[in-house]
């Protein structure tokens, strides 16, 4: 929220799209980011769309030679490329368009020649602010994942706007005009609103762009060339929603960035901006958390109670935000989100167990649900686990006398050759492996939906999420294989509510697709291995009926599959910690 606007009656300049930006090293660097084919395509667009925001190219004032009219040969056009001076400027727009679409697009012509042609011949005085902004956005259009976007939310006053839908009253053009008036109190700037393709023109696939799903605002400081041609602040407003995707900055520090977002909130009729709640870790985050009041507002009046949602794919973030029941807050009830929310199918429909025998969050896709309990053995997959090599003590036993070997019989290795199984056993294991694979595929389809066509991955119904973070408050399992009881009293540790609990984070380019593959591959199962001797303690008294079976040999120990040691705490009723009293962060989204 803007607290202290400029007291000056005369506002600072808000540059228009047609204002001139002289050539500079920064502008040359911005031009050099594009490939030569992209430069040719962009210049062709400038020549075809002669709008008021574009500066027209400089043409030659020489009259065409007798009998030549406006058409020229390719040889003459090549001379125009190699001889960069006024004498070689084109006489008409058609001639210039022919130059850029013909010889200039030849791969033998270097990109440096095209850059020199723009800066010295066709646009020697400079480009407009709109043309500079298109240079930046043309680069981002072809590289959709080149920026990292974070989510903020516009907060509206319920007393003024009871419906909380003030963002629907203003169009993107009105917001741009009001935003320019607000920013004029603080610094000289330029705001570029990227035009979206009209719905009736979207039939042609060539004109579609991922930016058409947003109202794209690019804000830069002016008039210094390094600021005009710099990164700037990019704001993607989801139309008819209070959500913004933000990337970039204005100058050094975060003051100008927060000031511009507060001005955007005022332009959209909102009272303040809601940022992601800072995670305690750094000294700056701890200081900011200490400054927040009971309502979660900082000294500037900005709220910081929103759950963190960021990523490189703006369309994936948009898909999450557009769902009316989506939740970004870490304290929100994830079970309230329907099947369409990021999480995919039934994997998002987990209900928290309130006691009893009902399924809870511990039965989700990351932990094998109760319905998927099966024999924990690799033989279901048609694989017989090999016997580990003999330890040093076992090798010594072989070389000792017969009296010593009788006290501890040597373990016999199991042969892995095909002749080690009868045909009936081989056939049975093959049938069991096939049944298991079909069951795993069925469960993956139930949890995450059907697998997409590998030749058309765009039809995948799973939303692309780059990070899923869980904060679970549950006791640590008593894993005797790690000798935890010899290090710390786990009972006392788990009974202390102040002790840190378990946090789980999954990251990747497509987390849900990865989980679907793991479930389909049967990696949520477990196998067994031979005990290396670390299992000591209370577990030694269990399963007395099997003690004689493994007497004289090494007792097998269960190995957990995906997600590993969390399988051991399934009986502890894993639950997510409920929201503290008075916490309204679950309503932020």
Swiss-Prot record:
Q: Where is this region: Disordered?
A: 328-365, 379-459, 525-555, 569-589
Skewed-composition ranges (Basic and acidic residues): 426-445
Pfam families in UniProt: CENP-N
Question: Spans of biased composition, class Acidic residues?
Answer: 536-545
Compositionally skewed regions (Polar residues) per UniProt:
398-425
Disulfide bridges in this chain? none
Name its GO BP terms in alphabetical order: CENP-A containing chromatin assembly; chromosome segregation
Its recorded name reads Putative uncharacterized protein UM10309
- Recorded source organism is Mycosarcoma maydis
